[in-house]
Amino acid sequence: MKRTTYILIGLFVAGFCMLVGGMFVMYCLGKPYFSNQINLQGEQLVQELPTCRVIWMTQTEMNTEERGIWLANSLLGVLPSKGEKNTFSCSEKVNEYLKMTVMGDTLKIVLDYSLIDFPQEFKASKYVGMITGDMQLNLTSKVECVINDIYMQKIALKKLTKDSISIDTPNSIMVDSCDFRALSVIRGGRNVEFQSGNINNLHLNLNRMNNWSVNVEECHIDTEYLTGQNASVQLQKGECRRMFWIPEKDDSKLKVTLTEKACVTVME
């Protein structure tokens, strides 16, 4: 085989690897791999929210047989309120498509982007990306649960001090510089990261989350309560003082890999 043939084959393989690698990276970042984008970023608008125990963020369906909108990865920051009111901030353009309703003790915030509003220049496109930019919730002590069903929007809990709070989302979660007596992760997405802070009681439903990790140097957990059907975990050195396994069924199993002496208790 001639040297030029080897070179051509090498270039082809290299190009193919770069294409596949680029698509994989963009998938991991949660960003669309198409060029058409609806940009809703812009100046931030801050508004007060009514008193509630639960805040539920969601979106309307943005896909039909003709076209679909891919929400590019964004961040929902959850921080403490500086006053006695809950507040929410997002770009002015995003706010135009938000609908808020109160249902009992739950505030529902819906990103309602109708395909009727689809830009004319994208009418021929099968898929279009939407960039919403980051959003932020500032919570009072009365909020006990945050649910986020906005596609691929990561939740970052920062500098929160609360007696207890529950997080329910199919997206990634990060906990940074928080102090909780009890934190419950009802659902968690691709990555749940406990970066720093203090958590007395951590409740995790392993059936409804993928990977989770603890930075043992900066995040201090007293007791972990793990529930599920069949799961496997590695208990890091210094990760927590006690671990409880709460099986969902009689035949549920938990495989624990220990890196030091630890107390693991099965609760019936």
Where are these regions (language model features)?
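Intrinsically disordered, low-complexity terminal regions
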Residues: 1-168, 172-176, 185-186, 194-195, ...
